[in-house]
Design a protein with these regions (language model features):
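Conserved short "hinge" loops at termini or chain/domain junctions
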Residues: 1-95, 109-166, 177-181, 221-224, ...
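Small/polar beta-strand repeat architecture
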Residues: 165-190, 195-231
Length: 246
């Protein structure tokens, strides 16, 4: 999932996050990207959920997400606000957030200033206090914008803390195997735990937005067909802090 280094050292591609590094500085920037991704995503998700994300990313050789919930978390998605069905949330994902944090971390550590072609290193003899103040204000704005996006990412996960959908029927066939016919399985996966009438079951043989199976004692009947589950279990976020301009 890693943010690409060309998003920083190529001005056209990088835009607001260009740092104008040369080839010799690429290793430093790569180290910063790796550190920032792990640091901020662990704080955003909590350690166990971050590990779950890394496990999903490791499935594909190119490091892209496999599960739809992680695809949406990373890339962004528009969805209906669970608390206001007439309101659509346009969640932007985490790439811009991470780029802002990388920008702040790298520039802060290497004392750069922004020019028309990116951010260049300050020369102590030629730079003025105005240069330094402008540079500091710039990187603070980038950092605080990333904090905004960080909170949006946490809000997205919190909106899916518990997800509920209603099955059309639950049928036992053969004995001890139950098939749940359900048209909404958003962010559900094989191996997940669902709750039906207060009891927990493990999802198997999932067919997206169609059905899934679980195994349980024979002879069960269900009157309440509400299926609930947690798409992002073990979500334990750390709230970020804004940088003051005072």
């Amino acid at each position: 999932m890693s943010v690409n280094i060309t998003q920083f050292n190529n001005y056209v591609a990088a835009g607001e996050f260009s740092v104008g590094v040369n080839t010799n500085e690429n290793n430093n920037l790569l180290e910063t990207i790796t550190f920032v991704e792990e640091e901020h995503l662990t704080r955003l998700l909590g350690a166990r959920l971050y590990n779950a994300l890394q496990t999903d990313l490791a499935i594909n050789n190119d490091g892209t997400a496999t599960a739809q919930k992680w695809i949406d978390f990373i890339n962004g998605v528009s969805y209906v606000d669970p608390s206001a069905s007439d309101y659509t949330i346009n969640y932007q994902g985490v790439f811009r957030m991470l780029k802002g944090f990388v920008f702040w971390q790298y520039i802060s550590e290497h004392q750069y200033k922004r020019t028309s072609t990116g951010v260049r290193k300050l020369n102590a003899e030629n730079s003025s206090m105005v240069d330094t103040q402008m540079t500091n204000a710039l990187i603070r704005r980038k950092y605080n914008k990333s904090v905004d996006l960080y909170l949006c990412a946490q809000h997205f996960i919190d909106d899916y803390k518990t997800y509920e959908a209603t099955a059309s029927n639950i049928v036992e066939s053969p004995a001890t195997t139950y098939t749940v016919t359900i048209s909404d399985t958003k962010y559900l996966a094989n191996g997940d735990t669902v709750t039906i009438e207060g009891n927990e079951y493990t999802v198997a043989n999932l067919v997206d937005d169609t059905s899934f199976e679980f195994t349980a004692t024979t002879g069960l009947t269900f009157t309440d067909l509400t299926v609930s589950y947690e798409p992002f279990p073990d979500f334990k976020p750390v709230k970020p802090k804004y940088i003051s301009f005072a």
